[in-house]
Each structure stands twice: as C-alpha cells, then as structure tokens.
C-alpha cells in the first residue's frame, strides 16, 4: 500500500469474554466501518477492497476472534502482509482480563468458552491464553478489562480512539403529530398541544413551522416562552447525564396534533439552542403527510 492511503485500520482481538463486543460497538459509535469475526485468511482480500477509492471508507475496525490454532497461523500470515504494506502502525488492540474475571463472566452469561473441553471455562481460557500469547506481544495497545464495566470500557475506547474535536454524543430532535402515533425511537417526548394552534389562523394554516410567520405566532405566547425555558433547563441538566451513562444518541420528540406547526417550530428552536454544546440534528416526521391525505 502506498503512503497516500488514508484508511485507518484497527484490529480488535484478545481473550474471549474480555469485551470485544463492547469494543466493536464503541468503534461503530466513532464512525468506523465494523466487521465482526472476519476469518483471518480473508483479511488481506478485505483490505484490498478498502483501497478502492469509490468505497469512501476511511476508518475500519475488525474483530479477529480466534477459535483455534489454524486461525492463529493464518492471522499471523495476514499480519505479516499488512505490516509490509504499512497498514499496522498503531492498530492492534488486545483486550485482556484475569482468569477469575473471565470465568465469572462466563458463569453469569451461562455461555461456554469456545475452546473449553467438558464445559469447563478455565480449561478453555488457559488454552486460549497460550495461543494468544505471541499475538498479545505484537499488540500496540492492551486494555485490561478485569475491573471495567461495559460503560467504562466504552469510555476508555472513546477517549483513546476518537479524533480531536469529534463529538460522539448527539441529540436528534424530531417533530411529529399525535394523530399519526408516537415515534417508536423516542427517548423523551414533549406534548405541545396545549399551546395556541396556528391551524386555526387562516393565513397560517397552509404553512408549516418552518415559516417565520408561523414560528413568530408560536413563540409570541408567554406559555411558549415558559415551556422553552423549562425544557431548556431540563435538557441542560439531563444531557450530560445521558452522555455520562454512555448513550451515543438521544432522540427528543416534540408532538402537536398534526406535526405541522407547533412541534416543527419548537424542534427547530431546541436544535439550534442546544447546538452550542452538542451535535444536534432535527427532522420533521409528519410535515408532508397533510399533502397526501
């Protein structure tokens, strides 16, 4: 590979039960194209596809989950090829944990270790640790997850691998009409049907909350301003808590009767207000439904 290749590669490997599933989910939140359990023999071919400029894939994370020595041999062959092509400057992440912690995790999940004989996880763990010892030595980064909860592991990965100024947590405001049902993906729902309805103002009825005349009408009422102040205070308090708990996205739904006027104007407003501290998005689920009814 030439030096102009911009694709960033992270290979996630390590002990079974050490947190590879949490790790790959964390890389997904960072915008990586993720593949779980790619056979090592397919790794060079897969990366050849990544070289195709039309893919426009700049960040790739792969979980290499070894299930036997035959995979181990083919993985090292693949790593040797990648090293010659300058893929692996700082891209092998090895997740580890003490035997006692791994045994406890397998007991809690009631799953068997992939290399265990007679269902005894410790036997499989010892065998896997022996197989992976050399690979562990080649890793550029090792994370011991013994004392880490899934949330802590995610935070650690985000801290290490996120790009400068990259914001992982985002807030999506969506307007909707109650007559069409609640958004199924909403985390928080606010009902603004108590506010004066532009639908009953003849010159505003055919417009939407995206129109300045409609938004001015919605915002001119004291109840609207009180609602905005209280919701802004609530979100200012809650968003850092959701972020701290490890959520990558919060969906805030704002509903009025038909999803045309009040909810649209307010969703736009909150998206702009909160954009000072967060990555925000706004969409209007039902804004076009009146046209087809």
UniProtKB/Swiss-Prot annotation:
The keyword Nucleotide-binding applies. ATP binds at residues 14-21. It holds the Pfam family RapZ-like_N. InterPro entries: P-loop_NTPase, RapZ-like, RapZ-like_N, RapZ_C. GTP binds at residues 65-68. Keywords: ATP-binding, GTP-binding, Nucleotide-binding. GO terms for molecular function: ATP binding; GTP binding. The keyword Ubl conjugation does not apply. Displays ATPase and GTPase activities. HAMAP family: RapZ_like. Belongs to the RapZ-like family. This is Nucleotide-binding protein OB2468.
């Amino acid at each position: 590979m030439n030096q102009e290749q911009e694709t960033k590669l992270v290979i996630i490997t390590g002990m079974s039960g050490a947190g590879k599933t949490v790790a790959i989910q964390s890389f997904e939140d960072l915008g990586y194209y993720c593949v779980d359990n790619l056979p090592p023999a397919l790794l060079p071919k897969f990366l050849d596809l990544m070289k195709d400029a039309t893919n426009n894939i700049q960040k790739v994370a792969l979980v290499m989950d070894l299930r036997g020595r035959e995979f181990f041999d083919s993985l090292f062959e693949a790593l040797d090829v990648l090293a010659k092509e300058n893929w692996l400057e700082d891209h092998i992440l090895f997740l580890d944990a003490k035997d006692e912690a791994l045994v406890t995790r397998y007991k809690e999940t009631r799953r068997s270790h992939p290399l265990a004989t007679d269902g005894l996880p410790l036997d499989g763990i010892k065998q896997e640790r022996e197989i992976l010892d050399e690979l562990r030595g080649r890793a550029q980064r090792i994370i011991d997850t013994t004392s880490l909860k899934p949330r802590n592991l995610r935070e650690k990965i985000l801290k290490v691998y996120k790009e400068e100024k990259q914001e992982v947590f985002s807030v999506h405001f969506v307007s909707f009409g109650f007559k069409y049902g609640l958004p199924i993906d909403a985390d928080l729902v606010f009902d603004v049907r108590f506010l004066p309805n532009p639908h009953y103002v003849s010159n505003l009825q055919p417009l939407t909350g995206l129109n300045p005349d409609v938004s001015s009408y919605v915002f001119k009422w004291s109840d609207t301003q009180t609602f905005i102040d209280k919701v802004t205070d609530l979100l200012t308090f809650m968003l850092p808590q959701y972020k701290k708990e490890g959520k990558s996205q919060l969906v805030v739904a704002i509903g009025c009767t038909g999803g045309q006027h009040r909810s649209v104007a307010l969703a736009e407003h909150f998206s702009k207000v909160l954009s000072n501290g967060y990555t925000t998005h706004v969409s209007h689920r039902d804004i076009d439904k009146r046209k087809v009814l």
